[in-house]
């Protein structure tokens, strides 16, 4: 009593405390960063290494394996995958959440240094690493186009100046420049001219390398002066190299221009980038794992005007893609939903109380509680994101509950004629324990979420803490500010205030009367009601088992990613044409705003596209509907497939794939993996639960298999090294020298002119100069025949791996797909030497599925423990928890009706329902126990009176929570995919629970009371506490 009096009789102090909470919240709100979701990115580091011309198998065995053995010893590595293709190896290290990425980067560098001695000596540079996940969609894509500058010049400008500047911006993890390569002097050799002049390819390479030397020359010095020695030992341009003497034939000089075409070109001619089907250089910007996407994008945009000033007028720099507008629009939508929820909740209170003064009290309590939460969010390092703002939206119904319970009880005493201050003291004292029980038991629901590990735990932690803080502040406000405002604002009324019998009040009285009559009938037929309770338990279990499940709702972020996979023997020229054709088809779609893409490099038969859709208010279709429409249009393109997927704010794993979900096959026997992967992929592609099934195992690339006749080579004076150098010089785009410039270093690249390598007859023109100086054609000592070879070799850990990627058809869930895959693997009889497991998001889904039931049971057990401690009883918590099955039935039925799978967001809704619906039972049980103690009423009469007396606050709190969640169900626009499952779950659970628990709770209460009496030896008092 003294506690409540302290605040009721000191209104100024109470108001100032509330103002202080509000001001702190406003300050925290202004300082909070903005993000789509809580920070849940795994620390990922990518290691890259190159050896131009080396086959995928060579890269895997000589580069990837030594690096993997060294990197695999680093502590905290969650997963290590690698992919080796023509001349390139990429290793992805995914670390545990608790691993600091900067410390991990130091360990990665140390591991690379340790493996350096085991790597091939011909590598043009040491392996490098980047602190970014290559599988993440870029947060921004910039394009450079020009009518006067070449693609190589644009690439040089982008790589040397723009990428360097952007990479220094806080939050930027990686700037990947694509669409071409650095400028280079290309030496395209004429094999016929070389043969006629008797010049070997190795002699040309040596001559070029020896002619371009950057070495210190020292200085001259006398007693008074010092002169730096400078020579023309460097060659910079194609014009400098063209007159270079590479050989003497019969005393006549053979110059490089006589046997080759020398040009200022690019390092790798097999690269292409486009924007809207036009040539372009792309700057794909990815953020650091721990960086905030909105802050990073804002920082980049702030630097763009400065960068624009450094760009020549003939170069056009444009933002082709920016992921932040849809994120901002989504947050604006949820903020509007929050405001609507607050307004609806206040409206509910007004309809029940029909008093402006009374309505003002919760209208003040709710904003104070919600705004004050922002201060705690800032101190906890949280952000304003979809989940934290949804937590505040749902909290609207919670925080008003406490104020409603206190306000309604004080109003009841005022209507009975009690003076305001006395009613405030008496009313708050009566329900103080009830409000405390409701709040503590509600917070207890979220304790298991706080202890949950992995990505789901990280994802839900902000939601749980934000909601718990809001409830805690609401508890303090409802026990301090609310009683004070009631005591000073409200007036005493007559015992039977006529306003209760007008309009909505008359309807409420009629409903309450009808409820009383029906409750008497239910109490007389308690066995039937007991069967209903048992039925809801069984039905909720069955619905949970049968409902389709997924990890996270599919979001419409307004950005699509597309992976092109063409025939494995396709040429670069044909692949570039496919990219352009796909772009034209997509660009014609009315929902598409911009398309960018690139192809080439080490994977000639693949490409990547990024598609920006128009804003939601300018298109009528969702991202998935656009994908379905484009899939039909793109299906007729011969020789290539384009796999589209909507970019999500959550993507797990470092694998780059052409679909949203992955299933990985592992084996220590490479031949077994290559035998079974096509069978498994074909079987999975036939499943109706899967779409866009594809694999990263590509074993049918065209290869020309050369077999040396070593005896003949020995007789002719030719070594295997000579023959291999010939092939590398001719076909490997071999980097044979370096040109040093002030801002960058460029390469001299040598290969046979592509005009002579259009078919296998190019091998007939190749020759080696033997030890006697005679040209020996390759055909004299080697035979060749076409064969198949892998385009890439993939590892996970140290095992050979193949990842099958898939999307979900419209109307299918991830649980259905997972079950179908497991069933298919069993039916195929895959041997134990080939192991299958889900990867990435699908793997996290499997882990979450196993933890969901445990999490729900842990929440129920925690609530039981808290309630048992509060009531000092083993029985009463069971009565209160009996309300949960009906809520579960309602929630799961609502998801089924709306055709929404059970996701992590729906799980949050179930957890919230555990906290919400038990409030009704707490109010009933609390008043019934008090009536038995103080009024000496029988249990039947006590629970009956409790139900009638608490009918109005129960209806108010339930409707307030329901209307607080209703805007989530009805919301559209950006981000509605996240909000709707939460709203559907809560509204469905509340409706069903309200219909049943008003009747089942009294029956369960009486059942346990009779059970207690039957086993109790002390029956002198009606209730033993």
Swiss-Prot record:
Record-linked SUPFAM superfamilies: Multidrug efflux transporter AcrB pore domain, PN1, PN2, PC1 and PC2 subdomains (SSF82693), Multidrug efflux transporter AcrB TolC docking domain, DN and DC subdomains (SSF82714), Multidrug efflux transporter AcrB transmembrane domain (SSF82866)
Residue ranges the record marks as coiled coil: none
Protein location: Cell inner membrane
One of the record's GO cellular component terms: plasma membrane
Gene3D superfamilies on file: Multidrug efflux transporter AcrB pore domain (3.30.70.1440), Multidrug efflux transporter AcrB pore domain like (3.30.70.1320), Multidrug efflux transporter AcrB TolC docking domain, DN and DC subdomains (3.30.2090.10), Multidrug efflux transporter AcrB transmembrane domain (1.20.1640.10)
Keywords, alphabetical: Cell inner membrane, Cell membrane, Membrane, Transmembrane, Transmembrane helix, Transport
Residue intervals passing through the bilayer: 15-35, 333-353, 360-380, 387-407, 431-451, 469-489, 528-548, 851-871, 875-895, 897-917, 953-973, 984-1004
Entry's family note: Belongs to the resistance-nodulation-cell division (RND) (TC 2.A.6) family. MdtC subfamily.
Assembly behavior: Part of a tripartite efflux system composed of MdtA, MdtB and MdtC. MdtC forms a heteromultimer with MdtB.
Protein name: Multidrug resistance protein MdtC
Gene: mdtC
């Amino acid at each position: 009593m003294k506690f409540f009096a302290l605040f009721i009789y000191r209104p100024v102090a109470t108001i100032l405390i509330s103002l202080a909470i509000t001001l702190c919240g406003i300050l925290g709100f202004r300082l909070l960063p903005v993000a789509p979701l809580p920070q849940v990115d795994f620390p990922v580091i990518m290691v890259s290494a190159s050896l131009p011309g080396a086959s995928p198998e060579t890269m895997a065995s000589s580069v990837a394996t030594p690096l993997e053995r060294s990197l695999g010893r680093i502590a905290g590595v969650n997963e290590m995958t690698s992919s080796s293709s023509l001349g390139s190896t990429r290793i992805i290290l995914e670390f545990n959440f608790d691993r600091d990425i900067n410390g991990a980067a130091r360990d990665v560098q140390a591991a690379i240094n340790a493996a350096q001695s085991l790597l091939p000596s011909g590598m043009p540079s040491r392996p490098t690493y980047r602190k970014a996940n290559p599988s993440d969609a870029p947060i921004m894509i910039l394009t450079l186009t020009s009518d006067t500058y070449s693609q190589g010049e644009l690439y040089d400008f982008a790589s040397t100046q723009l990428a360097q500047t952007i990479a220094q911006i806080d939050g930027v993890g990686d700037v990947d420049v694509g669409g071409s390569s650095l400028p280079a002097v290309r030496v395209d050799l004429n094999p016929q001219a070389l043969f006629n002049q008797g010049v070997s390819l190795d002699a040309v390479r040596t001559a070029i390398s020896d002619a371009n030397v950057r070495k210190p020359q020292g200085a001259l010095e006398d007693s008074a002066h010092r002169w730096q020695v400078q020579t023309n030992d460097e060659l910079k341009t194609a014009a400098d190299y063209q007159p270079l003497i590479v050989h003497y034939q019969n005393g006549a000089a053979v110059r490089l221009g006589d046997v080759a075409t020398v040009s200022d070109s690019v390092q790798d001619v097999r690269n292409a980038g486009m924007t809207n089907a036009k040539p372009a250089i792309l700057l794909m910007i990815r953020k650091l794992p721990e960086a905030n996407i909105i802050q990073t994008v804002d920082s980049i945009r702030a630097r763009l005007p400065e960068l624009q000033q450094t760009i020549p007028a003939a170069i056009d720099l444009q933002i082709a893609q920016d992921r932040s507008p849809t994120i901002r629009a989504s947050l604006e939508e949820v903020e509007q939903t929050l405001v609507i929820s607050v307004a609806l909740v206040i409206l509910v209170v007004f309809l029940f109380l029909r008093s402006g003064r009374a309505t003002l009290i919760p209208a003040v309590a709710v904003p104070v509680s919600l705004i004050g939460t922002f201060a705690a969010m800032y101190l906890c390092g949280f952000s304003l994101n979809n989940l934290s703002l949804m937590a505040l939206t749902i909290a609207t119904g919670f925080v008003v509950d406490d104020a409603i319970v206190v306000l309604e009880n004080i109003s009841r005493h005022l209507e009975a004629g009690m003076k305001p201050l006395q009613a405030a003291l008496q009313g708050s004292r009566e329900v103080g324990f009830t409000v405390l029980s409701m709040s503590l038991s509600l917070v207890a629901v979220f304790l298991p979420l706080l202890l949950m590990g992995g990505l789901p735990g990280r994802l839900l932690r902000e939601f749980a803490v934000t909601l718990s803080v809001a409830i805690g502040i609401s508890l303090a406000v409802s026990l301090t500010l609310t009683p004070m405002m009631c005591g000073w604002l409200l007036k005493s009324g007559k015992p039977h205030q006529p306003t209760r019998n007008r309009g909505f009040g008359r309807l409420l009285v009629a409903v309450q009367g009808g409820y009383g009559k029906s409750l008497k009938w239910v109490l007389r037929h308690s066995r039937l009601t007991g069967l209903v309770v048992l039925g809801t338990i069984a039905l909720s279990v069955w619905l949970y088992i049968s409902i389709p499940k997924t990890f996270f709702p599919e979001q419409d972020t307004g950005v699509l990613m597309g992976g092109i996979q063409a025939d494995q023997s396709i040429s670069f020229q044909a692949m570039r044409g496919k990219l352009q054709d796909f772009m034209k088809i997509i660009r014609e779609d009315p929902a598409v705003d911009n398309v960018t893409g690139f192809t080439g490099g080490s994977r000639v038969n693949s490409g990547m596209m990024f598609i920006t859709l128009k804003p939601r208010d300018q298109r009528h279709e969702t991202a998935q509907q656009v994908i379905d429409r484009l899939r039909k249009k793109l299906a007729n393109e011969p020789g290539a497939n384009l796999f589209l997927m909507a970019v999500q704010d959550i993507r797990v794993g470092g694998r780059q794939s052409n679909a949203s979900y992955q299933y990985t096959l592992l084996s220590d026997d490479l031949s077994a993996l290559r035998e079974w992967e096509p069978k498994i992929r074909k079987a999975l592609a036939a499943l109706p639960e899967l779409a866009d099934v594809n694999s990263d195992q590509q074993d049918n690339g065209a290869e020309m298999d050369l077999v040396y006749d070593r005896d003949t080579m020995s007789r002719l004076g030719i070594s295997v090294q000579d023959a291999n150098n010939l092939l590398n010089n001719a076909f490997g785009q071999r980097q044979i020298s370096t040109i040093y410039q002030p801002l960058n270093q460029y390469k001299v690249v040598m290969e046979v002119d592509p005009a002579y390598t259009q078919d296998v007859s190019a091998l007939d023109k190749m020759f080696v100069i033997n030890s006697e100086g005679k040209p020996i054609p390759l055909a004299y000592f080697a035979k060749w025949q076409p064969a198949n070879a892998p385009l890439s070799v993939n590892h996970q850990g140290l095992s050979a791996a193949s990842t099958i990627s898939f999307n979900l058809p419209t109307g299918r869930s991830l649980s259905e797909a997972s079950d179908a895959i497991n069933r298919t693997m069993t039916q195929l009889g895959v041997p134990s030497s080939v192991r299958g497991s889900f990867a990435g998001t699908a793997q996290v889904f499997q882990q979450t599925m196993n933890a969901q039931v445990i999490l729900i049971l842990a929440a129920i057990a925690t609530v039981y423990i808290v309630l048992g401690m509060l009531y000092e009883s083993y029985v009463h918590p069971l009565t209160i928890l009996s309300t949960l099955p009906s809520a579960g039935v309602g929630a799961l039925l609502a998801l089924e009706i709306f055709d929404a799978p059970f996701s992590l967001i729906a799980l949050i809704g179930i957890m919230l329902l555990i906290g919400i619906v038990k409030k009704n039972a707490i109010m009933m049980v609390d008043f019934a126990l008090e009536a038995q103690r103080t009024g000496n009423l029988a249990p039947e009469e006590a629970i009956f009176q409790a139900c009638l007396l608490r009918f109005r606050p129960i209806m108010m709190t339930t409707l307030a929570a329901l209307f607080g969640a209703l805007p989530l169900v009805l919301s559209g626009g950006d981000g509605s995919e996240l909000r709707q499952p939460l709203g559907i779950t809560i509204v469905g659970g509340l409706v069903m629970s309200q219909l049943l628990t008003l009747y089942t709770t009294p029956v369960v209460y009486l059942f346990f009371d009779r059970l207690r009496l039957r086993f109790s030896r002390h029956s002198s008092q009606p209730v033993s506490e």
